[in-house]
Each structure stands twice: as structure tokens, then as C-alpha cells.
């Protein structure tokens, strides 16, 4: 059975969830995204010859910044004091793509799934932004939550 939507009140109006009575627990979430591109574009990134600089370093910093600002982007997200944000980028030459994995962690009253998803998404968008001059048809795909732990709903992990 599906749970109730927590951001909708009895009148059907959107509201920020009241987490004031919840206990602080350690919460962690991992998300991923893929950026598919032409082999030549990926090679440009990997060779360090991109005219805008280090694409992976820029995407990593953008993802970290985005996680910290998720509450400003997603209307009903709480501002969180994140204790860890990690963004890893892996080139997959055989698939002509980049895999991005983010990790967010805190000790608090609400989960960090949206922060992890935002970090992976913005890192992917940054790769697109930096490479759009050489390729317009880059595809961002398969953005998803991989795992979350902590809180009332417990542990979730996607099937491999």
C-alpha cells in the first residue's frame, strides 16, 4: 500500500512538513545521473583540451553547491545543515557517457534524498553547459535515487 503524500494537507494544499517533533538521526542518500555524448566530446573532456577548463572539477563543485542550496530550488524542502556532500564522476568510454554519483549525509530531522538528487542533476547540467558549444544533443538520463538510510522509513536501496 502506498503512503500518504506528506506535503499535502487535509484541504489538498501544499505545505512544508513539520519536522519539529522528529528525533535527529543520521541520514544518508546516494543518487546517480548519466550524461551521454558523442565519443569526440567525451575525449575532449578527458584529454583536458576543453576550452572552458576542467569539466569534471567544475561539475563536481556545481553538484556540491547545488546540494547545499536544494531548499532554495525545491519549494517544500527544508534548509539542511549537511555534514557531507560528495560528487564523483566516472567516464564510461564504452558507453560514451559520464556517470555521476552523489552522496549527502547529515544528522537531522529529515532526509537528504532531494539534496543527493539535486547534486547529481546539477553536476549533469554543468557538463551539458560546458560542452554545448561542441555538441547540442547531449542527453542527461537515468537520474535516480540509489539508496537512502535513516529516519522513520528506514533503509531503501535500488535493486542492482
Curated annotation (Swiss-Prot):
It catalyses: (8S)-3',8-cyclo-7,8-dihydroguanosine 5'-triphosphate = cyclic pyranopterin phosphate + diphosphate. The keyword Lyase applies. Substrate binds at residues 76-78, 114-115. Keywords: Lyase, Molybdenum cofactor biosynthesis. The keyword Glycosyltransferase does not apply. GO terms for molecular function: cyclic pyranopterin monophosphate synthase activity; GTP 3',8'-cyclase activity. Its EC number is 4.6.1.17. The active site is at 129. GO terms for biological process: Mo-molybdopterin cofactor biosynthetic process. SUPFAM superfamilies: Molybdenum cofactor biosynthesis protein C, MoaC. Pathway: Cofactor biosynthesis; molybdopterin biosynthesis. InterPro entries: MoaC, MoaC_bact/euk, MoaC_sf, MoCo_biosynth_MoaA/MoaC, Mopterin_CF_biosynth-C_dom. Homohexamer; trimer of dimers. Belongs to the MoaC family. Catalyzes the conversion of (8S)-3',8-cyclo-7,8-dihydroguanosine 5'-triphosphate to cyclic pyranopterin monophosphate (cPMP). HAMAP family: MoaC_B. This is Cyclic pyranopterin monophosphate synthase. It comes from Vibrio cholerae serotype O1 (strain ATCC 39541 / Classical Ogawa 395 / O395). The lineage of its organism: Bacteria, Pseudomonadati, Pseudomonadota, Gammaproteobacteria, Vibrionales.
Amino acid at each position: 500500500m502506498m503512503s500518504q503524500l506528506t506535503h499535502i494537507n487535509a484541504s489538498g494544499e501544499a505545505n512544508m512538513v513539520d519536522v519539529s517533533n522528529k528525533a535527529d538521526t543520521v541520514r544518508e542518500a546516494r543518487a546517480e545521473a548519466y550524461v551521454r555524448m558523442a565519443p569526440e566530446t567525451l575525449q575532449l573532456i578527458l584529454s583536458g583540451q576543453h576550452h572552458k577548463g576542467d569539466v569534471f572539477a567544475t561539475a563536481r563543485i556545481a553538484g556540491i553547491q547545488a546540494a547545499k542550496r536544494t531548499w532554495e530550488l525545491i519549494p517544500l524542502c527544508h534548509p539542511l545543515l549537511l555534514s557531507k556532500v560528495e560528487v564523483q564522476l566516472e567516464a564510461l568510454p564504452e558507453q560514451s557517457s559520464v556517470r555521476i554519483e552523489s552522496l549527502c549525509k547529515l544528522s537531522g530531522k529529515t532526509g537528504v534524498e532531494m539534496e543527493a538528487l539535486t547534486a547529481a542533476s546539477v553536476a549533469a547540467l554543468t557538463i551539458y553547459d560546458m560542452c554545448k558549444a561542441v555538441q547540442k544533443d547531449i542527453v542527461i538520463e537515468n537520474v535516480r535515487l540509489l539508496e537512502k538510510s535513516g529516519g522513520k522509513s528506514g533503509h531503501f536501496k535500488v535493486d542492482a
